[in-house]
Amino acid sequence: MQKLAIVGGGISGLSLAYYLQNDYEITVFEKDKWGGKAYTQKVGNYLFEEGVNGFLNNSPKTLELCEKIGIKPIKADENAKIRYIYDDKLIKLPSKPVEFLTSDIMSLKGKIRILKEFFIKPVCEREESVKEFAIRRLGKEFYRKMMIPMLAGIYASTPEITSMNAAFPKLKKIECEYGSLFKGLNKLKRGGEPTGELHSFEYGMSEFINKLKEKTKANFVIKEIKDVDELKDFDKIVIATEAYSASEILKKYEKLSDLLKKIPYNPVAIVGLDFESITPKSFGILTIKNKTLGILMDKYIFPNRNGIRAMLGGARYSEIKDLNEEEIIKTALDDIYEIIKNANPKITWLKLHKNAIPNYSLSHQKLVEDIFTEAEKFNIYLTGNAYNGISFNDCIKNSFELAERLKK
Ligand SMILES: Cc1cc2nc3c(=O)[nH]c(=O)nc-3n(C[C@H](O)[C@H](O)[C@H](O)COP(=O)(O)OP(=O)(O)OC[C@H]3O[C@@H](n4cnc5c(N)ncnc54)[C@H](O)[C@@H]3O)c2cc1C
């Protein structure tokens, strides 16, 4: 049997090892924690996710993997359907797009502008930023009130530095196929509502990671790989790390290494907290201009969580990575007091990811194409959230597809 080295024990590396366990003799190298950004920290009675909060149940590959390894995801509480944005005051988000027209989230002028979306010509021949796309199709007010918080919540980024084509390829495709988002979503009978429901596991994402490892026949080694030459004994190599780590490991291939370095990352600090009483009972709150990008009301979403988490920084406030623990917690507490009027936490917990999430910047798709073409020249394979999809679901799907290629 051929020997395969997988560098990186996040969901991308681990799911790849699972899919290929009967085809290769596999060794997975991880420098830190199994699960990478999918890691649950237990602090007394509290479970705090260091990264991934959950996943939508609209990706067949993730659900299939859960079934194969024998773990049952749990659905988020009904409260998770209630979401807010904070724009000097808390505003409840409509749960269905039609409710936009009756809610007070947008001015009358803003609502009329949204309806004009039906008649805006599509732009398909060139790439656009999320900002350009949103203002062009839905207007400035929608852009400010919806896209700024959404980008912070999903990508820890800002719409002006994010590529619409790379970050939301499905929406871009709908625009180009149907001429308008509303026409397309209507034809697809989606009505613009989310296509899946949020799920996680009873004891957090680490429960899944541990089970996945348990069901995978591979050598799991805690070791930082500093140079690809350390893997000379293997027939095939997959790098499933962050792009900047891949760049370092592959430094001997200068052009490939330089291309990988071009994928920027945004920092995120996560502060776990609990207070005597917390409202609103909901999934959470996204902000438009605070240093805290959002507050996740974990205790109202999944069992055993008990606390809440504030997510700070991102591209909006990248200085977060240079603050010390005390300063980060103070920043979170100031925002929490402003937004939900809570003070004097019973507990505080902090995780700082200096390089949390890759930014899908303008030209990201071309950059990824160049990276993959260059890597293939050296028989090196890459997978992970830096390339073709940022979500937990995307990582599993992409590793499945790579596994199918490596089986051939
Ligand atoms: C704060 C935060 C919240 C998120 N929330 C969600 C969410 O709710 N839902 C969702 O779908 N997605 C979420 N994501 C995105 C999600 O984390 C990722 O898409 C996915 O978990 C990434 O998995 P990965 O295996 O590609 O990368 P990672 O999890 O980053 O794994 C890469 C691994 O490689 C290891 N490594 C790096 N260099 C080396 C080396 N030289 N040698 C050995 N090992 C090395 C690292 O230690 C790490 O474990 C979130 C991300 C963050 C940061």
Question: What is the meaning of each model-derived region?
Answer:
Residues 40, 94-98, 298-408:
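Conserved flavin/dinucleotide-binding core of flavoenzymes
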Residues 12, 34, 244:
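Conserved Rossmann-like nucleotide-cofactor binding loop
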